[in-house]
């Protein structure tokens, strides 16, 4: 990591070797385990597209990267860490410049909740923040394909004790059933035969957020989306088979791209067993919607959503059809800029107008790209907005 001063799971990246004068707090998001600060810094600064931290430094801002011991913990639990970080930044800064606070993916929800709570709770200090920012944050919910959730739980039930694949399967299933995933996902299933719906944990979180007014009120709210605002999707055709495997352990097992209406979205079958059919009803055709694309890092690289299923099928000894639709929408553009309900199929594909968003200003990518990918287009827009504050 570049020079910086660590504070627990945070690190200060000052513009000069001194205490922070104009702090910008950037929160990590959802993933397994604790924050890898070196990896997070690398993604922001050495991604090959845009040196976000260096550009903030050039604008005279001091960067504080905020991480968590458990990125699968509930949003409200990690918001306590964010509140502590904000309070400490206010206390330790030199001068009285207001802060900019926000985050990537779920990190934007954590800091949104933290700032709103600091405004509502008289027992907490003033956040002294002028700007809230989010980067492809699921303000209206995230999309984990129901077919992929079902396959993950199914494979874990069948091969969770496998000496090689078992740990990875249990980790993936646990990740989907973690408090954070349940709070983010607009549709969740905890097991293969469950009905897709909002988890109780999500409803509880949304209720708590509503009690705080939904948003911090005393800040300017900005955000960016890794999806387009034009309404043009990513090309994943609703109802088509995304991935199919057959062989040593699976028989004619396939996952489909989500379509509207009553659908069979997955057929799951192991050798010698009856097939398990996974159905949905009333869901939108969201896999192909404009938005930040599902990314999943593995030893094989970024597999994407259905590409991950293809990898698992192969590792389980099966032949996977070659025409895999590797990935799908993860954070719809209308969720990232808080401009519509992702349960509404018309809203998902409708062009986003300037006045549609709950944010004061937003910018959408010129193409549908990987979730939280740092690009010059989005990074430079954020830096300019922060510098102008």
Language-model features, listed with the residues they occupy:
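Short, surface-exposed "cap/lid" segments of acyl-processing enzymes
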Residues: 2-65
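Active-site-proximal beta-strand/loop segments in catalytic clefts of secreted hydrolases
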Residues: 27-30, 66-69, 104-105, 135-138, ...
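Loop/turn elements at helix/coil->beta-strand transitions in domains of secreted/extracellular proteins
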Residues: 19-23, 58-64, 94-99, 125-131, ...
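Extended ligand-binding clefts on enzyme/binding-domain cores
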Residues: 114, 214-224, 229-233
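Serine-dependent carboxylesterase/thioesterase catalytic core
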Residues: 79-201, 205-207, 229-273
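Catalytic nucleophile-loop/oxyanion-hole region of alpha/beta-hydrolase
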Residues: 68-83
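Terminal low-complexity/disordered tails
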Residues: 1-7, 241-389
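A Trp-anchored, charged/polar loop motif used as the substrate-binding/catalytic surface
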Residues: 3-13, 194-214
